[in-house]
Structure formats: structure tokens, C-alpha cells
Amino acid sequence: MTDQLTIAITTPLEAEHVATIRAVDPRITVLYEPDILPVPRYHADHTGDPSFRRTSEQEQRFLAMLAQADVAFDFDRSHLADLPVIAPKLKWVQATSSGIGQTIMRAGLEDSGIVFTTASGVHARPLADFCLMAMLMFAKDYWLMARDKAAKRWERYSGEELTGKTLAIIGLGRVGKEVASHGKKLDMRVVGLRRSTEPVANVDKIYARAELHEMLAEADVLVLIAPHTPDTEGMIGEAELAVMKPSALLINIARHQLVDEPALIRALQEGRLAGAALDVVSSEPLPPDSPLWDLPNVIISPHSASTVTQENARITAIFCENLRRYLACEPLINVLDTKALY
């Protein structure tokens, strides 16, 4: 390991977190110029204002910063495919997202020699909380309460409870395990699908991929958390939706490519599926003419289920731990497998 390490921060980051990174080791030099980065629109906004464009002078400064970097905290999507050229010293990138596999593949960086580490684990609790919110909103018929409130109508009704319902989870990584934990606290029956059939805490039964339809037929709630890979693309289509209960709820906090969206819309419109909570859709931002906006049994989240005010602090903690490991020539955590894409 060299005596000095230059880090370029390429995403908006609060000053206290920049200071935390600088304090990891005296051998570290941190390059951070907020004025050449997009202005964040909300806490932990890693892409910033989409209308932002660098001036020629700002672009030169940005490229000069990357040219010096041994390590980068996140990546700028406008300079991803050419990253090995403009940042020839770059050895490692710490991403601020968990699901970066497809992005790295599309940029042709899987064989670049650059190590990518992800923010895996940071978003587990917020995403699980989103699933819990969606399940309770449907069980307690939040929309009926909202309609009655708007009409100033007081009329008692009966809801459902989640106890004894079957929660099916596709993808039992950190997020899936957190969702399973929430389900068990509500005394739900929890089942899951994963590549390995090894037991998982809080999961009553593990299904193999060949048993997908069997699992779907049991599900009262289906949560999609698996990464987008060639194996998972389109895994929930017309045939899969057809075997689900008409009373079932589908929650997608993974990637939109896992679901055949037109088939999902038809199932919701025709009453073959009770509802959906979608943090991801095929076109983001969701266009005004999408039928999803008008479906009363759909929750739309603008890809924000994982975003909380504490996010940057948690990502910084992972990065700082990895910096200590990197300087000590120890294995990094959350390393992206550029072949499996997760």
C-alpha cells in the first residue's frame, strides 16, 4: 500500500461526513468541491438536481479531481464508461447504492480492474419499514379512512389482521431478512425463495426457483427484493400473477425488470390481484399517462422507500471501515461480484 491515498468525493455529502472520512488516517487526502456537483434536493440525494450542468471550467476541475484519485466515493454517471481513462489511478469505488451491478455492466466496467463496493445493508431497515407500512395500509384499509375523512363521514368498518397470513419473500439477503423479522413480529407465516436452501432466521420455509409457482399460490403478501440479473428478469409475469390469490398484495422494492408491468396493471385492473406497492416502475419518473396513477389499489413511491435522513451517515461508516481495511491490506466488505452482478 502506498503511503498516501487520494480520495475524490463525487456526490453531494454533508460537511460532517467529509470530516469523518478525513479523520480516518493521516495518509488520506480528500478532494471535495461541492460547487462542481449537483445541488441535492433532499437528504441523501446522491444524483442531485437533474438540470445541473457543469460549466467548462467546472468540468475541467471535476476531471482534474478524478485524475488524482486512488479511490472514489460514489461515481458520476456522466463519466462512468470512460472512468478508467479519466481516472487512470483509480483502484476502488465506494458506491452509495446497493444495486449497482447492471449499471457497472452497462458501462462495460466489469473487467476494468476497478473494485466496486456497495452500500449493501444500509437500506435494509428503511426498506423493510416501507413493506410494513404497505402491508398495514392494505390490511387496515387506509384508503377507506382517507375517503371517509375527505367526505367528513363517520362510519365504522372491519379491517384485516396480518397474524397468520403468509408473507412470501423473493430475495433473502439483508433486506429480505429484515422484512422476515418484521413479518414474524406480526406472527405471520414467512416463506422465501433464494438460490440456497439453507435455513434463514424468521423464515418458516425456503423454496427453490423451480417451486416459484407453489410459493406464489400461498402468498398473501409477495415482496420482491432480489437483484436484477438475467435469471430474475421478468420472473413475475402473466403466468406467475395468475397463480396468486386475488386477495394478495405485491410489493416491489427491488428493480422494475423483475415484473412484467403491463401484466401487473391488467391483473390490478381486473381484480385478479388486490393491490401493489411499487417503489420502482419501468419509466422513472412515472409519466402522467401511466394507468398506475389512477389505480386506487396501488401505492406509488418515487424510488424513495430506502431513503432516510440517516443514510449518508451509514454509508460513510461503511466507507470509513473499508478505508481502514484498504490501508491495512485487509479484505473489503460489500465487494460487488462483477460476474454475478451483486
Language-model regions: role of each:
Residues 115, 145-178:
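Glycine-rich NAD(P)-binding loop of Rossmann-like domains
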Residues 35-40, 185-202:
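NAD(P)-binding Rossmann-fold cofactor-contacting core
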Residues 128-144, 185-188, 317-330:
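Oxidoreductase and adenylate-handling cofactor-binding alpha/beta cores
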